[in-house]
Structure formats: structure tokens, C-alpha cells
Amino acid sequence: MQNPRRTKYRKQHRGRLRGISSRGNVVSFGKYALQALEPAWITARQIEAGRRAITRHARRGGKLWIRIFPDKPITMRPAETRMGSGKGSPEYWVSVIKPGRIIYELGGVSKEVAEAAMLIAAHKMPIQTRLVTSEKL
């Protein structure tokens, strides 16, 4: 699972998910990509589950690029704790995803293999996604 080695601040505000992705929304490395259609927080565990699914299905020959990184800490308070006494401690990490963001890219495999691998990975995601192809053929 991915998480930052060190951050400037341990805790962050939750923020809001507004607008569409202006960066990371074109296929840059591979030939096929999985693109988000909804805004969401995707956890490091979900990213890892998708990565495992794609690498298992693509086998050898395929190269995978993960275009998102979980850099936002999500804090949680211990169970049955009274209100007050500050913000909880960081529990897990998420990546903030806006519509249009490329999540995974895959190259070096056939279209059928890429479609099947991305479909399996899409089932691991908490959002609607679609398969996109690079225009440089």
C-alpha cells in the first residue's frame, strides 16, 4: 500500500469535491486507461486492490502505471470516545479523485486483455469508471 514518507502537516481538513479534473486527465504513458466519472476519495487499499487485479490479469508483457497517489490523511477517533479533546489520529490515506481523472494506465497488451483487466479493476473502485484509449495509435 502507498502512503507518503513524510508530510508537512499530520492532519488535513476534509475539503470538498467540486468541479472536474484539470490535471491528469489525458492518457500519457500507456495505450489504455481507466478514467473516473465521479468524484470520490479512493483509499490506498482500493488502489492496491485494483493494481493487483490488473497485474494478475495482464500477466507478463503488460506495463502498468498508477496515476494517482494517496496523499490525504483521514483521521478517526477511537471508538466510544467522548466529544472534544482534539482531532483523531490519522488512520488511512486517500487520493482525492475528480471526474475525468486517469487512475490506471496499461500498455503492452492487446485490447481484449486490457478491457478485461480494467473491468476487474473497475469493480474494485467505489465510483463509476470508463476505459479510454490513447489517440496516438
UniProtKB/Swiss-Prot annotation:
<dbReference type="InterPro" id="IPR036920">
    <property type="entry name" value="Ribosomal_uL16_sf"/>
</dbReference>
<dbReference type="InterPro" id="IPR016180">
    <property type="entry name" value="Ribosomal_uL16_dom"/>
</dbReference>
<keyword id="KW-0687">Ribonucleoprotein</keyword>
<dbReference type="Pfam" id="PF00252">
    <property type="entry name" value="Ribosomal_L16"/>
</dbReference>
<dbReference type="GO" id="GO:0019843">
    <property type="term" value="F:rRNA binding"/>
</dbReference>
<dbReference type="GO" id="GO:0005762">
    <property type="term" value="C:mitochondrial large ribosomal subunit"/>
</dbReference>
<dbReference type="InterPro" id="IPR000114">
    <property type="entry name" value="Ribosomal_uL16_bact-type"/>
</dbReference>
<comment type="similarity">
    <text>Belongs to the universal ribosomal protein uL16 family.</text>
</comment>
<protein>
    <recommendedName>
        <fullName>Large ribosomal subunit protein uL16c</fullName>
    </recommendedName>
</protein>
<keyword id="KW-0150">Chloroplast</keyword>
<dbReference type="GO" id="GO:0009507">
    <property type="term" value="C:chloroplast"/>
</dbReference>
<comment type="subunit">
    <text>Part of the 50S ribosomal subunit.</text>
</comment>
<keyword id="KW-0934">Plastid</keyword>
<dbReference type="GO" id="GO:0032543">
    <property type="term" value="P:mitochondrial translation"/>
</dbReference>
<dbReference type="GO" id="GO:0003735">
    <property type="term" value="F:structural constituent of ribosome"/>
</dbReference>
<dbReference type="InterPro" id="IPR020798">
    <property type="entry name" value="Ribosomal_uL16_CS"/>
</dbReference>
<keyword id="KW-0689">Ribosomal protein</keyword>
<dbReference type="InterPro" id="IPR047873">
    <property type="entry name" value="Ribosomal_uL16"/>
</dbReference>
